[in-house]
Amino acid sequence: MNKIYLENDESTNKLGVLISERLKEINKSTIEIHLEGDLGAGKTFLARSIISNSGWSGLVKSPTYTLCEEYDLGDVIFLHIDLYRTDEPEDIHIFDLDRKTHLKKLIIIEWAQKLAIKRNFHLKISFEHFEDGRKVLINDNDELFSSLIKHYE
């Protein structure tokens, strides 16, 4: 696990740009990213940055009330999920995350710490308020994002 410091929205957006660039290079049919942290820690801001910098030109809405927003970019589909308002462990099953698709599937789960049944992830980012910015722990489960981590060393 690696720790970095994000001082402001600009540095958080830069992390989103780096992740979106790496996502384009990874040759996997499904990539899952888990985002954890308190309210206002930067989870949704980072998810918006990743999706926008991957080619989505429209509004990236927070899925806090809808639970899931889908973004079809033609060859890639993003499933942006927010578990903040979920109470039941089975709530995650309604999204059918493991469904087969001809598109590359990129799953971003906010409040992943609320998952009752742990799912495999490729990247987990945990936000923590620190001074005027954020301390961020990055867990690259299978080293697909090692270049991202090296950028901050």
Segments the model singles out, each with a brief description of its role:
Residues 43:
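Conserved lysine of the Walker
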Residues 22-30:
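Phosphate-binding P-loop
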